[in-house]
């Protein structure tokens, strides 16, 4: 069983467990992103509007990059803005021939990270100036698209940096 949710009730804790994960798998073409959620399994969604971070870990050859490619394909069908970083110049770097904002060279990676951060801070300031802005709400509440920084092989990037840059 997989623990998929934990909710505190008045006088007890309610756990939601996912059993028979193999039967809950979906095909790649069934992975979809809509309404701030991305479908990962029949009954499992990543609610990126609520939890905008994801760490994918696993052994060599375990399918991490193919999983990321699947996420990218689903997100391309939304109004999201994607930035793809692949310091090993491997599978994700190949996307540069069919889409924008794909980086694999050290200088380009650093520039993308800096630009992404600056745009994030600027967007945050612009959001605070909007009429319908509310503290604690995010871009989705304001009807803005999600922005994703997708980083494959982060450890390889850290190794690529010198001590000063690190």
What are these regions (language model features)?
Residues 2-6, 42-43, 136-138:
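Catalytic micro-motifs at enzyme active sites that drive phosphoryl/nucleotidyl and oxygen chemistry
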Residues 24-128, 145-148, 154-166:
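P-loop NTPase catalytic phosphate-binding loop
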Residues 1-33:
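N-terminal "pre-motor" subdomain/linker immediately upstream of P-loop NTPase catalytic cores
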Residues 115, 119, 133-142:
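Conserved alpha-helical scaffold flanking the Walker A/P-loop in AAA+ ATPase domains
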Residues 11, 143-145:
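A short, glycine/Asx- and small/polar-enriched loop/turn
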